[in-house]
UniProtKB/Swiss-Prot annotation:
It catalyses: all-trans-retinol + 2 reduced [adrenodoxin] + O2 + 2 H(+) = all-trans-3,4-didehydroretinol + 2 oxidized [adrenodoxin] + 2 H2O. The gene is cyp27c1. The keyword Metal-binding applies. GO terms for molecular function: all-trans retinal 3,4-desaturase activity; all-trans retinoic acid 3,4-desaturase activity; all-trans retinol 3,4-desaturase activity; all-trans-retinol binding; heme binding; iron ion binding; monooxygenase activity; retinoic acid binding. Induction: In the retinal pigment epithelium, up-regulated by L-thyroxine (at protein level). GO terms for cellular component: membrane; mitochondrion. The keyword Lipid metabolism applies. Disruption phenotype: Mutant fish survive to adulthood without overt developmental abnormalities. Upon treatment with L-thyroxine, the mutant fish eyes fail to produce any vitamin A2 and their photoreceptors fail to undergo a red-shift in sensitivity. PANTHER family: CYTOCHROME P450 (PTHR24279), CYTOCHROME P450 FAMILY 27 SUBFAMILY C MEMBER 1 (PTHR24279:SF122). It is found in: Membrane. This is Cytochrome P450 27C1.
Amino acid sequence: MALQSTILHMARKNLLQESCRQLLIQTHGLHKSVASGSLEIAAHSQADLKEESAVSPAEEVQKAARVKSLKEMPGPSTVANLLEFFYRDGFSRIHEIQMEHAKKYGKIFKSRFGPQFVVSIADRDMVAQVLRSESATPQRGNMESWKEYRDLRGRSTGLISAEGDEWLKMRSVLRQLIMRPRDVAVFSSDVNDVVADLVKRVKTLRSQQDDSQTVLNINDLFFKYAMEGVATILYETRLGCLENEIPKMSQEYITALHLMFSSFKTTMYAGAIPKWLRPIIPKPWEEFCSSWDGLFKFSQIHVDKRLSEIKKQMEKSEEIKGGLLTHMLVTREMNLEEIYANMTEMLLAGVDTTSFTLSWSTYLLARHPTIQQQIFEEVDRVLGGRVPTGEDVPYLPLIRGLVKETLRLFPVLPGNGRVTHDDLIVGGYLIPKGTQLALCHYSTSMDEENFPRPEEFRPDRWIRKDASDRVDNFGSIPFGYGIRSCIGRRIAELEMHLALTQLLQNFHIEVSPQTTEVHAKTHGLLCPGASINLRFTDRK
């Protein structure tokens, strides 16, 4: 009875919302007709609306009465799930398990991992429904370990780990600085300086090999490029990651970051084990805390350094100029602990995500020389030999398509989490408020219904044929959607677009004979399962 009552209440609520939506659309249609001097537009809009949404209250209630409970939702048993992850190395195959479960149980299914109950959604339209129904402060999936560490150390949460009004305040500060392409384009000069060092580093590394062309383990190089590029924007300083000798402080950060991702599996183990067992199995939690200690220490040193410089400038009555960090320190829209936390989390989020995408992009270009040549010809036609800027990127649709297609095939986050803010009916099931959802982005991006021939690498699938053509959809949303989408998206795209463009200007990229076919594995993020070794031959 409780379930039926809830469903009927939601049916009435949905019907009321639909009625309001119809009224708004009709009003909009009438407004258009008055503005254009033609009543045909309004009449056509209303006719279409009547045809599309002529659902009676009785039909709406009858439809809602067919809604099922979570008990009726299919999914693997708890024992089967634990066996999959603990004994069959499921942690490194999360992206594959998504597709296996979607094929076996359907595009919405439930699972339990230790104390965590999750509803997984592997359907584009259902994902869209969930994201479009979010509140003003969407809640991510389970990040209790992040919050627990911050409570333990007395640290603030940052944009990734914060929730509610605290998160909304931080986002409102940061979004005005780095969310729009034109805002990020001002960093083109700084990023291009880093790209120039990347090109030099490619030449140095290949000269160390017998064939004078091969760069081994390309992801290590792109990791250092991404770290240098993100830090240049966030901290307004160079770290020396692309030098022959990396400074000690930067190397310590790299070590801490590697530890963070290497401890992903053990941290997941810890999430499935009650806290009272930590004294018996202490290593996962100790490594997790140790890596965060290193990351926060690194950020605090650089933030404090810039703060000291600003204070000296103010004492001398000098004009204070700078970028993102300077703005945050001068305006004081966040306190110092919040700045430490946000700098730490944004750097963490911006390094491996960018480096993995660049690794996959260059690997795909090397394996598809015809496509590589097409993209190079576009770059050469638009730029000639000059260095690109952020303003050039809109005129390089194949470069943009290259990044989008790479992220479709290898989404850095194979899945994303949400906690429902209200009761939802999704896929014919009533999902109660407070339920943890897993949005299966890898599965939707490889779905034939969303992308014909999904296994093929086709950057041109993202090019619009005309102004009315929309090729983007919820099947591939690597940066998320809506108000809780990735805050650093524009920075990451700028780094990738400028780097890929200039690598193609300088080199023809081939797969080294030392590299066999590389498959993806999940290691917190979706990363190459083996070293990618590439040959870089000068174009000139």
